[in-house]
Each structure stands twice: as C-alpha cells, then as structure tokens.
C-alpha cells in the first residue's frame, strides 16, 4: 500500500459523516511522504520544534506550536508519542511512529476525539508494522 493510500483511505476517511480538513505523513526529517491536496506547507523549523517536543515533552507549551505559520495552543497529549493542538474551533493531532509523523488537522463539526482516533489508529498500526 502506498503512503498516499494511507492518507486518502485511512486519514481522510469519513467518521460519523465528517472527515479531517487535511492530513499528511512525514518522515522525522520533515520530508513529505504523502499528503491530502489541501495540506498546508510546513516550514522546516516547525518540524524541528515538533520533533524536539516529542523528545522533550513540554518544549512547545510556553510558545505554542506553529504549523504553516498558524499558532496552535498545545494541549495534553502522550509524552514522546502524541502532540495535540487547538486553534479556535479546530485543531491538530500528531502521532510519532518509529520513522514517521502522522498528522491530522480538523475543523468543526469534526471533534478533537474523532481526529485523535483517526490519526492515532493509523499511527499505532504503523508502529505495529515496524514503521
């Protein structure tokens, strides 16, 4: 299965009539493996900040997390594994696997829990596959 198929079929899938606004899978170095058509352009320093927060949980909390120049308030995640962010009526979930970052961005009416479920389910599967 291609990385694009994971994005199209597993991240951009419909959940209770809703779907993510955009999604992507990155390498730990920030290389885009696959993304939805309207996924925002990450800056290299944003990926660096995300990886640092995954290595040193709490790094982004004081300043917020920037994604494509949009600021997200960092909310509780799983130290070293998941970062969650909130911005207005939407937010972001980032799941770290052995080799990748699985990213989902949502807006209302999708809920934070639905975004978390979609992103973390694929991330957990990739971890089980050694990815």
Swiss-Prot record:
PTM annotation (Phosphothreonine): residues: 111
Keywords: Actin-binding, Allergen, Cytoplasm, Cytoskeleton, Disulfide bond, Phosphoprotein
Organism: Phleum pratense (Common timothy)
Compartments, record wording: Cytoplasm, Cytoskeleton
Function as written in the Swiss-Prot or TrEMBL entry: Binds to actin and affects the structure of the cytoskeleton. At high concentrations, profilin prevents the polymerization of actin, whereas it enhances it at low concentrations. By binding to PIP2, it inhibits the formation of IP3 and DG.
Pfam families named among the record's database cross-references: Profilin
Gene Ontology CC annotations of this record: cell cortex; cytoskeleton
The protein, known as: Profilin-3
Record-linked Gene3D superfamilies: Dynein light chain 2a, cytoplasmic
Post-translational modification (record): Phosphorylated by MAP kinases.
Name of the coding gene: PRO3
Quaternary state and interactors: Occurs in many kinds of cells as a complex with monomeric actin in a 1:1 ratio.
Protein family according to the UniProt entry: Belongs to the profilin family.
Motif residue range(s): Involved in PIP2 interaction: 81-97
Example of a GO MF term: actin monomer binding
Additional remarks: The variability of the residues taking part of IgE-binding epitopes might be responsible of the difference in cross-reactivity among olive pollen cultivars, and between distantly related pollen species, leading to a variable range of allergy reactions among atopic patients.
Annotated S-S bridges: 13-115
Main location: cytoplasm
């Amino acid at each position: 299965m291609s990385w694009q198929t994971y994005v199209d079929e597993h991240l951009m899938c419909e959940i209770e009539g809703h779907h993510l606004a955009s999604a992507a899978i990155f390498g730990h170095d920030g290389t885009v493996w696959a993304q939805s058509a309207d996924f925002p352009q990450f800056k290299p320093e944003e990926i660096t900040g995300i990886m640092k927060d995954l290595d040193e949980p709490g790094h982004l909390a004081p300043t917020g997390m920037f994604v494509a120049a949009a600021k997200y308030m960092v909310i509780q995640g799983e130290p070293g594994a998941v970062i969650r962010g909130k911005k207005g009526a939407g937010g972001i979930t980032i799941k770290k696997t052995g080799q990748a970052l699985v990213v989902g961005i949502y807006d209302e009416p999708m809920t934070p829990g639905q975004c978390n479920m979609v992103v973390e389910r694929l991330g957990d599967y990739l971890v089980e596959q050694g990815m």
